[in-house]
């Protein structure tokens, strides 16, 4: 079967936004207008097609990125839904990897919010071209021009409106198309087509001003157009459109559109913009890959050539079991064929291939380069794994996933559920690389770790819904770390003589603090003249790493240390790897005790938005939680407080904030960095840990 949609007519796009900007509604309307979902699902009634997990229906926030295919003007649009809640940043990061372009949705009232900044940074990191859609133009306080200014000031981007709104709030009727210089008017709130009219008299000056800005922004991308512009020659519609696309793909501009998805206004022009200005898979830089031996290679988007794809999401589907969402970068994936998991060195058989239309599924025989689908039947493939052909086992860029910052102990309500809980947690950990499961060696408890309270709540919730396991959850535990503050040198001799062959290892170690944020550990071999034979050096390194797993103060993992082995001695008969490993491990612990060891705690970046009258209470409360306020600003009549707060003090914050502000304040919180714990707090932590 040949491909139905040529590569240049494929668009892989994500819709990224902050919670409540109306992302799900926008996705819904896109699916509606492209003719897939006939009844429009509303998020507030809990029936949106994109939000297909039960909890999303209850919480009204989008958690898992479902990939959905729809068609507009004969183009195939693969829509990847990205979550907007900060505990799920990992999901956003994961979907950014496989997108070619994005639609950033902003609320016309709320504008650029902290989560928008996080998502924007991720899109910059992966060089994703984007267009902005200012949604909810029908709401009280809607202001398109404010959002334009915030995109400039806060996101440091270059927004270029392709439309300006006609009216706002209840009087929002449509938009002025600044390319064709016509008014597009929707005459009712029902999902209908717009009517093209002349620009209303009171908007003609503003439209002219913004049209000129648009043309100038476009002209800057091309010398020929620049000459025309300076000679006062009008650019043709085609020239303007081509210029917008060039400038969008080079990330020089962010085209801005507006509308209200809820009232069905502005969605068709948004779809046109996706087709006209966002890139096809062959218009973005080739993805890089490498081979086992480290040799780099560029993987071109084409149906010819050996198969290469990235598994970017694992989901458990109640009907077909485990689904692996893949994006094909090169070649063709056929159902029933074998693929090679290059990173793991394993062959896997592809069962069925499904194309998802929200929550309906269509079985297809093949997926071509640039396309996205879900594969049934892969056993060993995890998020971020490359699938390739055995002839050309390329590994595409790995995704990097952050370490969890919060843990809780979970126990099944009944003994009978113990095994079921183990299976459930293992499956959930396969789906989500930022979620970890471990067993506490001392207590035997099962410990789950993740990126925030909401993240873990949802995991426990899913265990109950999908796997019917009821779990008791312990108090949240913070992922503390330990490090040292001064450089020390430490000698350690491990010598045991117990009849027959003895044990002998002797090392001199230098422990130095390293700058945080880089590698956690560095080992330097500085042995001169064979004082410690070469074959024992790796054992010394290993001994230090083992000692770092449990620090000297309270047994937390040790970070940011450089260890240099600079001298030692050995015994012809009694020395062994074991002896040197033990000498290094014990020497490391003794050295760490003298090196001003301190405890580090995760600091969260907290942003609170509150009505002014509660500002004093909110700041007072943050100070009580050992927070440091960095900045205060205004947004839409409210006060914004930016602060760093220790995660340990932030449990249950949402409830406290609600009661302080009568439910009128909102906040967002994400992990930022590790910082030293004050002495009095550190003493308490040590006392608690060492009982």
From Swiss-Prot:
GO terms for molecular function: GTP binding; GTPase activity; translation elongation factor activity. GO terms for biological process: ribosome disassembly. Keywords: Cytoplasm, Elongation factor, GTP-binding, Nucleotide-binding, Protein biosynthesis. GTP binds at residues 17-24, 81-85, 135-138. It comes from the Bacteria. Residues 8-282 form the tr-type G domain. It is found in: Cytoplasm. It holds the Pfam family GTP_EFTU. Its main location: cytoplasm. Gene3D superfamilies: 3.30.230.10, 3.30.70.240, Elongation Factor G (Translational Gtpase), domain 3, P-loop containing nucleotide triphosphate hydrolases, Translation factors. GO terms for cellular component: cytoplasm. Belongs to the TRAFAC class translation factor GTPase superfamily. Classic translation factor GTPase family. EF-G/EF-2 subfamily. NCBIfam families: EF-G, PRK12740.1-3, PRK12740.1-5, small_GTP. HAMAP family: EF_G_EF_2_B. Catalyzes the GTP-dependent ribosomal translocation step during translation elongation. During this step, the ribosome changes from the pre-translocational (PRE) to the post-translocational (POST) state as the newly formed A-site-bound peptidyl-tRNA and P-site-bound deacylated tRNA move to the P and E sites, respectively. Catalyzes the coordinated movement of the two tRNA molecules, the mRNA and conformational changes in the ribosome. This is Elongation factor G. It comes from Campylobacter hominis (strain ATCC BAA-381 / DSM 21671 / CCUG 45161 / LMG 19568 / NCTC 13146 / CH001A). The gene is fusA.
């Amino acid at each position: 079967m040949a491909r139905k949609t040529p590569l240049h007519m494929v668009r892989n796009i994500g819709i990224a936004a902050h919670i409540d900007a109306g992302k799900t509604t926008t996705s819904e309307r896109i699916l509606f207008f492209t003719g897939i979902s006939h009844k429009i699902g509303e998020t507030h009634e809990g029936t949106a097609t994109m939000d297909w997990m039960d909890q999303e229906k209850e919480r009204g926030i989008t958690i898992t990125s479902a990939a959905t295919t729809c068609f507009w003007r004969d183009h195939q649009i693969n829509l990847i839904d990205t979550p907007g809640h900060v505990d799920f940043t990992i999901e956003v990061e994961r979907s950014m990897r496989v997108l070619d372009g994005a639609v950033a949705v902003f609320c016309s009232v709320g504008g650029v919010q902290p989560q928008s900044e996080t998502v924007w940074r991720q899109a910059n990191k992966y060089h994703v071209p984007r267009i902005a859609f200012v949604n909810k133009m029908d709401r009280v306080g809607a202001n398109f021009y404010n959002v334009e200014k915030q995109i400039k000031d806060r996101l440091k981007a270059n927004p270029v409106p392709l439309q300006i709104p006609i009216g706002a709030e209840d009087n929002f009727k449509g938009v002025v198309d600044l390319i064709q210089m016509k008014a597009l008017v929707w005459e009712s709130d029902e999902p209908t087509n717009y009517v093209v009219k002349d620009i209303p008299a009171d908007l003609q000056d503003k439209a002219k001003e913004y049209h000129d800005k648009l043309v100038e922004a476009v002209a800057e991308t091309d010398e020929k157009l620049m000459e025309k512009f300076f000679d006062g020659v009008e650019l043709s519609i085609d020239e303007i459109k081509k210029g917008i696309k060039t400038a969008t793909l080079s990330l020089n501009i962010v085209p801005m559109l507006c509308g209200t998805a809820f009232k069905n206004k502005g969605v068709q022009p948004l779809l046109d913009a996706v087709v006209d200005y966002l890139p096809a898979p062959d218009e973005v830089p080739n993805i890089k890959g490498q081979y086992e031996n480290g040799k780099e290679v560029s993987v071109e988007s084409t149906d010819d050539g050996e198969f290469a794809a990235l598994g970017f999401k694992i989901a458990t589907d109640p009907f077909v079991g485990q689904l692996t969402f893949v994006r094909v970068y090169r070649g063709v994936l056929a159902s029933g064929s074998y693929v090679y998991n290059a990173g793991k060195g394993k062959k896997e058989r592809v069962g069925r291939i499904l194309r998802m239309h929200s929550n309906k599924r269509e079985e297809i025989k093949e997926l071509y380069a640039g396309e996205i689908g879900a594969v049934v039947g892969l056993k060993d493939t995890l998020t971020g794994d490359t699938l390739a052909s055995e002839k050309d086992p390329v590994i595409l860029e790995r995704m990097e996933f952050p370490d969890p910052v919060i843990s809780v102990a979970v126990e099944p309500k009944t003994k009978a559920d113990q095994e079921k809980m183990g299976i459930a947690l293992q499956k959930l950990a396969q789906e989500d690389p930022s979620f970890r499961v471990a067993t506490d060696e001392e207590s035997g408890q099962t410990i789950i770790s993740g990126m925030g309270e909401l993240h873990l709540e949802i995991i426990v919730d899913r265990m109950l819904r999908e796997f019917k396991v009821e779990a008791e959850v312990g108090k949240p535990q913070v992922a503390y770390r330990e490090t040292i503050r001064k450089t020390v040198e430490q000698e350690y001799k491990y010598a045991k003589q117990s009849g027959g062959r003895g044990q002998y290892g002797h090392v001199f170690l230098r422990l130095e603090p390293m700058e945080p944020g880089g590698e956690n550990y560095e080992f330097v071999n500085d042995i001169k003249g064979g004082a410690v034979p070469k074959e024992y050096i790796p054992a010394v390194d290993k001994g230090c790493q083992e000692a770092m797993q449990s620090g000297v103060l309270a047994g937390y993992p040790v970070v940011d240390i450089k260890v240099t082995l600079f001298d030692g001695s050995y015994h012809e008969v009694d020395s062994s790897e074991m002896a040197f490993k033990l000498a290094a491990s014990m020497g490391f612990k003794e050295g760490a005790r003298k090196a001003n060891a301190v405890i580090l705690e995760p600091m969260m970046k907290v942003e609170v938005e509150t009505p002014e009258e509660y500002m004093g209470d909110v700041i007072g409360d943050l100070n009580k939680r050992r927070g440091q306020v960095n900045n205060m600003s205004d947004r839409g009549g409210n006060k914004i407080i930016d602060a760093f707060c220790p995660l340990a003090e932030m449990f249950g914050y949402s409830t406290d904030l609600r009661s302080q502000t009568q439910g009128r304040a909102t906040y967002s919180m994400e992990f930022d960095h590790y910082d030293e714990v004050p002495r009095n707090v550190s003493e308490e932590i040590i006392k608690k840990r060492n009982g």
